[in-house]
Regions:
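Generic structural detector for well-ordered beta-strands
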Residues: 1, 68, 119-121
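A generic structural signal for short beta-strands and their flanking turns/coil linkers
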Residues: 6, 16-18, 58-65, 79, ...
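Catalytic strand-loop segment that frames the active site of acyl-thioester-processing enzymes
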Residues: 1-37, 124
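HotDog/MaoC-like acyl-thioester-processing domains
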Residues: 73-78, 82-131
Length: 131
């Protein structure tokens, strides 16, 4: 769950103190009617939720190809991530690989709030010569 404390902590960490995130009185005057989480907080949370799903050893994030913020995330929202593998490519004599992912972040109402595509370098499950 995204909490008010998460949003405040992210504002401190990132330096993004936009009042839409941290000032309830200001946020009440916006079309959202209340504070919303930073888009990058949602992206970071999605990354954390995805790290072991599916289980593999991630070496590095290589590229974030796209991110779309589809709907606001409010404090109190419960998020989950739907992950789809779009492409796999062997690298490093088969010891590593690049995986292209699509990740959809969905709230408790099954509404997609964020979507994106990224590439990670992962350790191969088996060396290429055994496949």
């Amino acid at each position: 769950m995204i909490t008010d404390a998460d949003v405040r902590s992210f504002a401190e960490l990132s330096g993004d103190h936009n009042p839409i995130h941290v000032n309830p009185e200001y946020a009440a005057t916006t079309p959202f009617g209340r504070t919303i989480a930073h888009g990058m907080l949602t992206l970071s949370r999605a990354s954390g939720m995805s790290i072991n799903h599916p289980p593999m050893r991630t070496i590095a994030v290589v590229e974030i190809r796209s991110v779309k913020f589809c709907a606001p995330v409010f404090p109190g929202d419960v998020l989950r991530v739907r992950t789809t593998v779009l492409n796999k490519e062997r690298r490093g004599r088969g010891k590593r690989g690049l995986v292209t992912w699509r990740r959809d972040v969905v709230n408790q109402d099954d509404k997609v709030v964020q979507t994106g595509e990224s590439v990670t370098m992962v350790e191969a499950r088996e060396p290429a010569e055994k496949i």
